[in-house]
Design a protein with these regions (language model features):
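Catalytic machinery of carbohydrate-active enzymes
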Residues: 1-195
């Protein structure tokens, strides 16, 4: 820190994305545009195992167990999405995550557990989806950045400063020790699908 010759202050009560944009703007002497655009584009993705119809990507995996949402709630949501004409696709990054996705998909006729995927393929699936529902994970932030209607589910952390944020439709549900219910998620999903 002794080599820095400039200091900038940003309001610590602002969302992390806004804080970082303001900090970069101050350091580089510009004012960030009000509209938030992450500038991400994703090439299309198709695979034989992926259904052709409308998709809802369910991002059930996260870095900590206390951020997980109960499988029983995922099953309720996935079944309801099937009734709404969406095919739930459940990816997972490692073996444990793919096993969880497979258990949920096996309990929901018509849901699909994705095979192991790279980030480009996963981003392609997210970009094709009509809706993304995910726990506190970077993939929920990616869905929001891609302007896919996104529901981010929080069970162990407060989303006020680090929840999903974008220019498309998004909603942060739950919070520290406040897991959202399947009913809350489905109510918000209705809003997202009508937006």
């Amino acid at each position: 820190a002794r080599f820095y010759d400039a200091h900038f202050r940003v309001d610590r009560t602002l969302h992390a994305v806004i804080r970082n944009r303001l900090l970069a703007g101050a350091a580089l002497d510009y004012t960030p545009e009000a509209a938030l655009d992450y500038g991400i584009t994703v090439p299309g993705f198709q695979a034989d195992w992926l259904p052709a119809g409308p998709l809802a990507v369910l991002l059930t995996a996260t870095s900590r167990d206390d951020k997980l949402w109960p499988e029983s709630e995922w099953i309720i949501v996935a079944r309801d999405l099937i009734r709404r004409g969406l095919t739930p696709v459940l990816p997972g990054g490692n073996v444990t995550e793919r096993e969880r996705a497979a258990r949920i998909a096996q309990a929901v006729d018509g849901a699909v557990a994705a095979p192991a995927l790279g980030i480009r393929e996963l981003a392609g699936i997210i970009a094709r989806s009509r809706l993304a529902i995910g726990v506190d994970t970077g993939l929920a932030h990616l869905a929001t950045a891609l302007k896919i209607p996104t529901l981010a589910l929080y069970t162990a952390t407060d989303p006020a400063l680090t929840g999903v944020l974008g220019s498309g439709w998004f909603r942060n549900l739950g919070g520290k020790n406040a897991s959202p219910s399947a009913t809350e998620v489905l109510t918000a999903a209705d809003e997202a699908l009508q937006a």
